[in-house]
C-alpha cells in the first residue's frame, strides 16, 4: 500500500492540472520540469510529490477516457 498524500499537495496538483491541462503528460520527468516552471515551490521533495500526483491523475484520466470510449 502506498502513502497518503497531504491535502496541500493534492489541492496544488489539481489546481495546476485544471489551470494548465496541456502542460502535463503521463511522464514524471516532464511533469517535474513543468511544475518547477509553473509553481514557486522551494522544496525539491514537495515539487516531486506534486509532480508524481499529477502524473497519477493524468494516467487515471487517460484510462477513464479509454474505458468510456470503448463502452
Swiss-Prot record:
GO terms for molecular function: structural constituent of ribosome. GO terms for biological process: translation. GO terms for cellular component: cytosol; ribonucleoprotein complex; ribosome. The keyword Iron-sulfur does not apply. Keywords: Ribonucleoprotein, Ribosomal protein. The keyword Ribosomal protein applies. PROSITE patterns: RIBOSOMAL_S17E. Belongs to the eukaryotic ribosomal protein eS17 family. PANTHER family: 40S RIBOSOMAL PROTEIN S17. This is Small ribosomal subunit protein eS17. The lineage of its organism: Archaea, Thermoproteota, Thermoprotei, Thermoproteales, Thermoproteaceae. The gene is rps17e.
Amino acid at each position: 500500500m502506498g502513502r497518503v498524500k497531504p491535502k496541500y499537495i493534492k489541492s496544488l496538483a489539481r489546481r495546476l492540472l485544471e489551470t494548465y491541462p496541456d502542460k502535463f503528460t503521463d511522464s514524471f520527468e516532464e511533469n517535474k520540469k513543468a511544475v518547477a516552471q509553473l509553481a514557486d515551490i522551494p522544496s525539491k521533495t514537495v515539487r516531486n510529490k506534486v509532480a508524481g500526483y499529477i502524473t497519477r491523475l493524468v494516467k487515471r484520466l487517460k484510462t477513464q477516457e479509454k474505458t468510456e470510449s470503448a463502452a
